[in-house]
Amino acid sequence: MNVAVVGCGSLGGVIAVRLAGRQGLHLQVLNRNSLIAEAASRQGLRLRVGGRWSTARVPLLPAPSRGPYDAVILAQKANGLERTCRELLPALAPRGFFLTTQNGLAGLELVRAFGPARVVPSCVLWGASMTSPGVYELTASGPFLLQAGEASPLPEARALLSQIFPVRLCPDITAVLWSKLAISASFTALGAISGLRFGQLAASPEGRRMILAIGEEVFRAARAQGVELGELGGGLNARRFLQPAGQGGYPPTRKHLLLRLMGWKHRRTESSMLDSLRRGRPTEIDFLNGLVVRAAEQAGLPAPWNRAVCQLVGEMERGLLQPQESNLIELGRRATAMQAGHAR
């Protein structure tokens, strides 16, 4: 099986190390980051899982050189994802397919653009960080989620991903991706704004309040589009987690307890958006919180917390702000002002 991994950041690097050397699999990593390429050439790609290290030497190339590909795992940021697919489409084998790993709904957009025979969206429930170029740490274990079904290329995608981490099938990948968006838009954005790790965010009562406020706006935007959030695994029902307690949601004490447990599991995970800001790269804010704002607008719903997040991250992208914990105070001030303005 001829496989390409596009991107060698925290997700792509872990995927590459886990797939390297698998029997019957020819792996190629498409990467344009010169620091990662230099590190890989010097010492290979290195992955730490607990106290154990793995090293893989795989070719890192700036452009495809050996096709056709039976599978292309898209591990890059959502920015430019469709352009990447259009560039690589001629390099796919007749039954080849793209596998998406991004947060947000970018995978669903690609299914609409290229068809279900060419695109398999997945939901990633494990976490990783790139601690230095070409050096990775698995910060939280978990499976890939795929839509249940037998239509090709789903069995092939399942077989490939199961060589990396366990795969679970779900009845509705759209609901799962919206559910993951409710979590990632909160933790990822707040981690970028504050510079805090996920465990630090969830340990703070105010941090948990903000996580819930952002997630509740995602819940309302999804429901307005006819999507009911569902199970994410680990006992977390995203709908009940974000729905008001008086309408069938968990009581506030249980929500805060679940967040503390979630934060503990992902305590070492840093926001990928924070990494983009530190490197002076565009973030995925438009594909996460920006998507929520647009969906809420279409439904005539307010989304002050997600809108304020977009404002602050935009200012950080322009160099007007730096990641720091005090930014959370400004976020709360702006969101509260927007709420008051909408209520008038």
State the predicted function of each range.
Residues 91, 113-118, 135-236:
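Internal alpha-helical scaffold of NAD(P)-dependent oxidoreductase catalytic cores
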Residues 29, 60-62, 146-148:
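Generic preference for hydrophobic
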Residues 212, 216-219, 223-344:
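NAD(P)-dependent Rossmann-like dehydrogenase/reductase catalytic/cofactor-binding core
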Residues 52-137:
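Rossmann-like NAD(P)(H) cofactor-binding subdomain of soluble oxidoreductases
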Residues 25-28, 69-72, 94-98, 143-144, ...:
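Short active-site oxyanion
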Residues 35-39, 107-109, 153-154:
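Short, charged/polar "capping" segments at the starts of alpha-helices
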Residues 1-53:
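NAD(P)+-binding Rossmann beta1-loop-alpha1 motif at the extreme N-terminus of oxidoreductases
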Residues 4, 26-28, 99, 120, ...:
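A structural signal for isolated positions on well-ordered beta-strands in alpha/beta enzyme cores
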